[in-house]
Amino acid sequence: MLKYDVIVIGGGHAGVEAAAASARLGVPTLLITLKPENLGEMSCNPAIGGIAKGTLVKEIDALDGLMGYVIDQAGIHYKMLNETRGPAVWGPRAQADRKLYKKAMYQILTNYPNLDILYGKVEDIEIKSSKIEAVILNNGSKILCQKIILTTGTFLSGLIHIGQKKIPAGRVDEEPSYGLSNTLKQIGFKLARLKTGTPPRIDGRTIDYSKTILQPGDKIPRPFSELTNIVNVSQINCFITKTTSETHDIIRENLDKSAMYSGQIEGIGPRYCPSIEDKIVRFSTKSEHRIFLEPEGLDDYTIYPNGISTSLPEDVQHKLIKTIPGLENVKVLRPGYAIEYDYVDPREISVTLETKKIAGLYLAGQINGTTGYEEAAGQGIIAGINAALAVKDQAPFMLTRANSYIGVMIDDLTTFGTIEPYRMFTSRSEYRLSLRADNSDLRLTELGMNIGVVSEKRKKIFTKKCEDIEKIKSLLNTLSLTTSKLAKMGIQVAQDGTYKTVLDLFKIPNFNVEQAIKIFPMLKETQNNNILQLLYIEAKYASYLTRQQADINLFQSEEAQFIPKNIDYFKIPSISLEIQEKLSAHKPTTIGVARRIPGITPAAITAIIIYLKTKYSDGSST
């Protein structure tokens, strides 16, 4: 009988990161997927990154994950979103060639040390004494294991809707999983339904691009991965069009035929990625909605019209598309659809992503109520790391709100839960100025090195980068000019007769890296504008970062105050019954987590701290 230490079920974005992370830690790992050729499949939009999402990708890369490196092998349109705003909200994004992305992912995983891939379908999980024993395949065979990571995406009782038509599926042409849904229900997990959707796909050869707006990418693509020196993939343009009043009329006239508005769908859809039906209803005063025409590949004429996700009948979809400028004669290759699926209340898992009910069972991705490739991948890498560390009897790996967007996401999910698909935003992070895309490796790579999940190659690159940062920082502190010379150059500085270093100049409004290079041409020789940009940001926002660090220190002190597992909140007399019940249900692990539970008052937190000091003064936490 086959036996593995860790088995990952599902080969989507969460699954591939989970499997690779577990394998990197030297643990024999098996990835079970319905179609190995679809590893890392982009089921919806052909793009990676975006605002906040791009930071997640950089954080995954910092821990030696796959997503950033793979998109650099397949990215055909790179664009830094929000670049005209502050660096805390910059969002690196890349349009992908779907085929190249899957090909690169497949090549990496099929040659990954300590990782095997099995074509198959898991029907059940064998559990004894609330511990994982094995997975059972649909052919009746059993594979023994210590840990299981469920990354089922939209496959748990998945149901596609196109108008009144219902198709049982995890995605187009792939069977759903009913067995695992039943298993989770029998265990006692709280399941609910969510919904997501995708737009119709259209033939780019039939688009009149003269009626659209050109959207070029960045002149020089900025790679996602620290392992990528330069993006060698050919770059192409995207285009923008918009809906019209006629489009909106057709949608309104047919709302009763939409699966979303006929009452056919139970699941709640993503608030921040609404269907075109939702947009017309919720924003009824808007006369138009933008549509981004995104190519799906270099040698693929399929276009993804981002912005018109729909569950309307096929004939209605054809009608509404014809009313969009440039798409009057377009050929529809595949209709859009909505899909609903089961998910588990994420308050059923801990911050390690292990379930509270079953030891050794981890959940990652859409099964936890999230939406998006990047959110799934971020959970996958943490679940994979922790499953492997548990096999090795090592301490768990936990990111926090203070050091990563991944930590923010996991804390939000495990503390508050979600009743709609959870998407990452910069606004969710209190410390977003410190948690930028450009410093992800400086925040997380050393943490990954400490637990052994980072390769030797990445270690060398990271060590060299840290050395270069110190060298360039020293140079920027050495290069200087008098205030009088700077004034002659048109740079507004106080005429106090002092010398101003480059780091001083970076603090001046509207002064940037390009100006510094113009004044001090030797900075060109550093040949690393990424480091110059990093140091520019750190200098420009130094005072804000210092204040934010004080907030982070306070947060970390509360996170370090652990709450014993066996604490009885009903024995703390100064706390109301309502709060006692909430704390007992949530089981917070630290004072910081307890403070973030809705309805927990500052007075209650003080009472807990006093109780812990008197009851557990010996440091006991059992």
From Swiss-Prot:
Annotated residues for binding of FAD: 10-15, 122, 177, 366
InterPro entries assigned: FAD/NAD-bd_sf, GIDA_C_N, MnmG, MnmG-rel, MnmG-rel_CS, MnmG_C, MnmG_C_subdom, MnmG_C_subdom_sf
Pfam families linked to this entry: GIDA, GIDA_C_1st, SAM_GIDA_C
GO molecular function, one term: flavin adenine dinucleotide binding
Localisation per UniProt entry: Cytoplasm
SMART domains registered for this protein in UniProt: GIDA_assoc_3
Keyword DNA repair: no
Keywords, alphabetical: Cytoplasm, FAD, Flavoprotein, NAD, tRNA processing
GO CC field: cytosol
Requisite cofactors: FAD
Residues that, per the record, bind NAD(+): 269-283
Quaternary structure and partners: Homodimer. Heterotetramer of two MnmE and two MnmG subunits.
Role this protein plays: NAD-binding protein involved in the addition of a carboxymethylaminomethyl (cmnm) group at the wobble position (U34) of certain tRNAs, forming tRNA-cmnm(5)s(2)U34.
Family: Belongs to the MnmG family.
UniProt-recorded name of the protein: tRNA uridine 5-carboxymethylaminomethyl modification enzyme MnmG
Organism: Rickettsia rickettsii (strain Sheila Smith)
